[in-house]
Amino acid sequence: CGTLMGGLSKILTECEHDVSGSDLNFYEPMSSQLEALKIDLVKGYERLPDADLYVIGNALSRGNPCVEKILEENLDYISGPEMLGKIIKSKKVIAVSGTHGKTTVSAMTASILQSKYGDVGYLIGGVLGDGSWSARLGSNEYFIVEADEYDSAFFDKRSKFIHYFPNILAINNIEFCLLYTSPSPRDTIRS
């Protein structure tokens, strides 16, 4: 389970949703975090858990048994970034983007705002140095999100950060290096 889907699972449990998930494998640090939340983790894609809405991560594509069942049965689904965007739409969103350092800058921003304003929300793509969760909804108006340029899902090729509508955008740095997301320097700048 990736850091976006794992963090989103944590936030959804805070919103009092029942959450379960399927993946081929569950790795640290996400596996421990999800197990602590008592989320039903299904190893493999043979069994699609019952749900009102399926949140599909960008690691899944057509041909995946769960994806195919969702499409064949016309079940409701959404991408992880779009789901997060809906949850945080009423917050003051601070998005941290750039080629390198997003996790570090996001964590530092969350820590600074936490000390100033209290219970801020965040979703960060890494483990925090103090051992706290990689995500939480927070009770105040601020939400910090690590906003990367990877596509949202097989059915939504837009960058994840398109869904976050930040009030503040921190662009850490831009480097032409990810040819699979931006085939030219112009595409890198445009995204």
Which functions belong to the PLM regions below?
Residues C1-M83:
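N-terminal leader/targeting and accessory segments in enzymes
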Residues I11-E14, P49, N58, R62-P183, ...:
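Phosphate-binding loop of NTP-binding sites
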